């Protein structure tokens, strides 16, 4: 029996695939569990339309990410932090703080998990932070840590 997979089934097929499976497997497992439905012209065209819409959505998201990476590349972000002796920070500057400061200064929301630090930031100075949007797309920002003025 030919079925169109509605969900991924390990070892059998992925969402959108149209494959031949045993009749009993299709009738007793795939169709009752709504993992697949019998393949017909209308079902395959519906799946193709959903796949095309998903591809357009992914392409749009990819273009937006590329634009954001281009806008943020080379941006200077400054953070004021409390310091102790020898310009050593109390605690450290985390990716959460950096992401919040990027959003505050540029208006662009960045997920903290996309930020990559080469080392923990525990002293004043200038650091390069990589924002990895996906495996092929990244940008670098310059992070400047300055001492908070005591009043």
UniProtKB/Swiss-Prot annotation:
Q: Which GO terms describe its cellular component?
A: ribonucleoprotein complex; ribosome
Q: Which Pfam families match?
A: Ribosomal_L9_C, Ribosomal_L9_N
The Gene Ontology biological process terms listed for this entry are: translation
Any coiled-coil regions, as ranges: none
Q: Which UniProt keywords apply?
A: Ribonucleoprotein, Ribosomal protein, RNA-binding, rRNA-binding
What InterPro entries does the annotation carry? Ribosomal_bL9, Ribosomal_bL9/RNase_H1_N, Ribosomal_bL9_bac/chp, Ribosomal_bL9_C, Ribosomal_bL9_C_sf, Ribosomal_bL9_N, Ribosomal_bL9_N_sf
Q: Which GO terms describe its molecular function?
A: rRNA binding; structural constituent of ribosome
> Which residues are connected by disulfide bridges in this protein?
none
* SUPFAM superfamilies the UniProt entry points to: L9 N-domain-like, Ribosomal protein L9 C-domain
The Swiss-Prot or TrEMBL record describes its family as follows: Belongs to the bacterial ribosomal protein bL9 family.
HAMAP family (alphabetical): Ribosomal_bL9
Biological role: Binds to the 23S rRNA.
**Name listed for the protein in its UniProt record:** Large ribosomal subunit protein bL9
This protein's species is: Dehalococcoides mccartyi (strain ATCC BAA-2266 / KCTC 15142 / 195) (Dehalococcoides ethenogenes (strain 195))
Lineage of producing organism: Bacteria, Bacillati, Chloroflexota, Dehalococcoidia, Dehalococcoidales
The encoding gene? rplI
């Amino acid at each position: 029996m030919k079925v169109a997979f509605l969900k991924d089934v390990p070892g059998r097929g992925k969402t959108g695939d149209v494959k031949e499976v045993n009749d009993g497997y299709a009738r007793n497992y795939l169709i009752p569990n709504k993992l697949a439905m019998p393949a017909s012209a209308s079902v395959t065209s519906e799946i193709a339309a959903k796949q095309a819409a998903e591809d357009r959505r992914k392409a749009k998201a990819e273009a937006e990410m590329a634009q954001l990476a281009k806008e943020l590349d080379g941006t200077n972000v400054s953070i004021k932090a409390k310091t102790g002796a020898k310009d050593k920070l109390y605690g450290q500057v985390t990716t959460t703080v950096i992401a919040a400061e990027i959003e505050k200064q540029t208006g662009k929301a960045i997920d903290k998990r996309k930020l990559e630090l080469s080392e923990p930031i525990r002293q004043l100075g200038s650091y390069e932070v990589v924002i990895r949007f996906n495996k092929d797309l990244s940008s670098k920002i310059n992070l400047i840590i300055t001492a908070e003025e005591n009043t």
